[in-house]
Amino acid sequence: WMLVLFGLIGMTACRQDTPRFRIGVAQCSDDSWRHKMNDEILREAMFYNGVSVEIRSAGDDNSKQAEDVHYFMDEGVDLLIISANEAAPMTPIVEEAYQKGIPVILVDRKILSDKYTAYIGADNYEIGRSVGNYIASSLKGKGNIVELTGLSGSTPAMERHQGFMAAISKFPDIKLIDKADAAWERGPAEIEMDSMLRRHPKIDAVYAHNDRIAPGAYQAAKMAGREKEMIFVGIDALPGKGNGLELVLDSVLDATFIYPTNG
């Protein structure tokens, strides 16, 4: 999609003799998945004269992301790309930018409104459904599952849970026995998983909403001497040190599902 966008920008630049086209990117967080997306955006922009890109990360903070979007509006950017940290808190600020006439592209995460120009992202409901079917099959239709979600107010976390529940609801002997918000991060995942292990003597599978949550859950289980009792499934499937593909090869994860960065 960025190729089409920059193609249109390039044609405009040829006709108008280099008015700069400024793009502001308001990222919700700062992690390996986001780094890959940012690199893809910057790499594509390099092919077009007169295009500048500035990227700001909110560090998983709604207030900081609202400040970032206001900053880009004040700077008079020509296009805003936003990955909303949480849907409800970010809806008013995205609507404000859109109503000022700034084209707004939402990437990966949605808001609770249709006041934006375009949305680009994977089908999180379908990813959750696929994970549910995979785990149900791996457990042969019977077992206890715990779920460690991304930030609960973000649309990917909502949709990944909904799709997962739709899948496992077809298996009466598959039970979701616990669920906690791990905020997309390893540290909270380890803490929440430790609590779950204390509450539940039998856990057969861990559904982690991304590949940072999954190793945190695994580490907690390993510290309790229970990591071999259950399978761990994540989402992202990035290559590289400590990422999902390596975790599968190292037998930390049973599987990881691809979630494209769309940069």
Question: How would you label these PLM feature ranges?
Answer:
Residues 13-263:
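A residue-level marker of the well-folded mature domains of exported/periplasmic proteins
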